[in-house]
């Protein structure tokens, strides 16, 4: 057996393609996020009301915004969205931005107080503050990238303001102590806070992705189980129980009917699997979750749609359909889901995949349920719509292909001809005593 070249070539070719494909997809999508970063959405809030200094009204917040916009023209990695604080909170609460830089209302007043000819006593002067907000619910890596960009912009603004304050101090008659000059060189205090906190048992904002991945895997495994069980019941496959092999009598049936049976069975086990996934994660593991009824419905629907889609691929392509389902639902889906590395930090190929790959839509809907109060515009409505489209596409594709196979007589197990069935069913007449076979044939 091992001396047959076909065995080695066939197995080796499939293994080579699968290993190469998984390596290119998994590593290729995540190997250089900073180099691929483009248009990462970050909110920029200027709540500064300005202050009077030297006989004129100044607004340091507007100067910071102008400086950030000027820098952004040559650097397309960050998409700064200028909004109000209320709008920023809404965007953070829907996962539309990965973070924010907030300029407070009294920013100009505290800056001008530092440059006053009669500054407050040392240690009593309030330092101007810029606040960087993170958003782990939108993705920990994306939130980290947003925080780094916002802090970089805040420290650059602090250095620019410090230069102006030092110039003002140098123009005064009384020189400032060295410690005071050092404080003026970097006057702004940059603080980091959580813009949309998630629970302590939310895997740092990754629980939605892991939950969605479990649902997809359950759908695929369920489809494989259903496919093998239906084929076993029809007598197409045997079942091994240790050394014992069992095989049912062959039941000839159409491909369309076989697919319909499998899909109906998949719907039934989706109820069980979806329920047990929620029980395991929420009840046993105490994962942070709300809207438990909606979570259950979403889980069952996801497993059912993924399972039905996999069964359609199995029915259309046979054994290669199992490998194809793995590529569609896992190999291409995980790196393009945007759950770990944000879509804005992926190569263009993976951004295109994210437009239709199921795991991306499933994860967004799961985030909306777990983190964003099940808001429809936080990704939940898109997830339901995508799930409905995928279900219709799977049904149409699966039944169209199997019906075509049936009409062309491409049965999974060739059926015996009608004449041979009749001969098999009609017993032969016994030969008369003393009559040879040749004589019997001649008599007939």
Question: Language-model segments: which ranges?
Answer:
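N-terminal membrane-entry
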Residues: 199-219
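Alpha-helical membrane-anchoring segments
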Residues: 6, 10, 209-212, 384
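Membrane-spanning alpha-helical segments of multipass transporters and channels
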Residues: 262-268, 276-279, 283-437, 442-443
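Extracytoplasmic/periplasmic domains immediately adjacent to an N-terminal transmembrane anchor
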Residues: 1-201, 205, 408-444
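Hydrophobic core segments of alpha-helical transmembrane domains
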Residues: 215-223, 394-398
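Helix-boundary and loop/linker segments of multi-pass membrane transporters
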Residues: 1, 248-252, 288
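Juxtamembrane interface at the cytosolic side of transmembrane helices
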Residues: 218-271
């Amino acid at each position: 057996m091992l001396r047959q070249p076909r065995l080695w070539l066939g197995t080796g070719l499939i293994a080579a393609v699968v290993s190469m494909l998984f390596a290119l997809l998994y590593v290729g999508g995540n190997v250089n996020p900073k180099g691929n970063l483009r248009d990462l959405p970050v909110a920029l809030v200027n709540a500064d009301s300005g202050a009077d200094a030297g006989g004129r009204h100044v607004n340091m917040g507007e100067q910071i915004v102008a400086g950030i916009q000027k820098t952004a023209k040559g650097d397309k990695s960050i998409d700064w969205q200028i909004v109000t604080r209320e709008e920023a909170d809404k965007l953070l609460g829907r996962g539309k931005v990965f973070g924010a830089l907030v300029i407070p209302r009294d920013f100009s007043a505290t800056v001008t107080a530092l440059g006053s000819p009669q500054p407050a006593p040392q240690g009593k002067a309030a330092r101007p503050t810029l606040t960087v907000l993170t958003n782990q619910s939108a993705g920990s890596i994306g939130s980290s990238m947003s925080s780094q960009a916002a802090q970089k912009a805040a420290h650059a603004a602090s250095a620019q303001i410090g230069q102006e304050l030092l110039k003002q101090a140098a123009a005064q008659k009384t020189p400032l102590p060295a410690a005071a000059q050092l404080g003026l060189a970097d006057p702004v205090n940059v603080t980091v806070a959580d813009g949309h906190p998630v629970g302590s048992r939310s895997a740092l904002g990754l629980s939605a992705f892991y939950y969605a991945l479990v649902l997809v895997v359950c759908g695929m495994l369920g489809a494989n189980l259903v496919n093998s069980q239906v084929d076993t019941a029809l007598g197409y496959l045997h079942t091994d129980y240790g050394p014992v092999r069992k095989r049912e009598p062959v039941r000839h049936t159409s491909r369309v009917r076989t697919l319909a049976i499998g899909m109906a069975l998949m719907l039934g086990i989706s109820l069980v699997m979806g329920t047990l996934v929620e029980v395991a994660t929420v009840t046993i593991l105490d994962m942070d979750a709300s809207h438990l009824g909606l979570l259950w419905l979403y889980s069952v629907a996801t497993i059912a749609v993924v399972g039905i889609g996999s069964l359609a691929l199995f029915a259309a392509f046979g054994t290669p359909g199992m490998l194809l389902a793995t590529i569609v639902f896992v190999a291409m889906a995980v790196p393009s889901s945007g759950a770990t590395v944000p879509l804005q930090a992926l190569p263009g190929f993976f951004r295109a995949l994210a437009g239709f790959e199921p795991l991306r839509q499933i994860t967004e809907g799961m985030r909306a349920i777990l983190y964003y109060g099940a808001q429809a515009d936080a990704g939940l409505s898109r997830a339901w719509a995508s799930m409905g489209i995928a279900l219709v596409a799977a049904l149409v594709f699966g039944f169209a292909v199997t019906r075509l196979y049936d009409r062309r007589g491409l049965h999974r197990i060739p059926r015996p001809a009608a004449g041979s069935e009749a001969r098999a069913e009609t017993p032969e007449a016994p030969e008369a005593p003393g009559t040879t076979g040749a004589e019997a044939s001649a008599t007939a």
